[in-house]
Amino acid sequence: MGTLIPEETLAMIGQRLSEPVTGTITSRDAQRFALAAGDRNPLYFDEAAARAAGYRTTLVPPVLLAWALNPPRPLDDLRADGLYRGEGKRVTLNVKRVMFGGEEWEFLEPVFAGDTITSETRLKSLEEKSGGSGPFVLQMTETTYTNQDGAVVARAVGRSIAR
């Protein structure tokens, strides 16, 4: 094998795929997300309930981290690989298509309304494999979410399948 992953792409493993993105998550953002998801947990809406539970203020629904730091942009700005034009390094593979293969999250610390979060995504691994319909590449990325105090609050490992 080895024909689907160019050498220069292998050299990208461990590198950052784009500049870090930083944003502050407001209570309004958190509450709107929770309502849209049908999650009426009082810890997202009621500061007194959050304090009674031992938190400093209301919490943020954990998966909101994936969306809160990326402002909406026109569909025409998207590249074929799902990234916006002018953003990030392209992971070049000798394949025709790439599809989402799942994502695993690890939530390490609570995120609070008003926290400023920075996300950073790196290419974790590239592995050429053989499947029933031929060779493919399993691509793994790792996104780390850090709060304003430098604490890592979450980590997401994403998988893409390229063939």
Where are these regions (language model features)?
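HotDog/MaoC-like acyl-thioester-processing domains
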Residues: 1-18, 100-163
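Hot-dog-fold acyl-thioester-processing enzymes
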Residues: 2-102
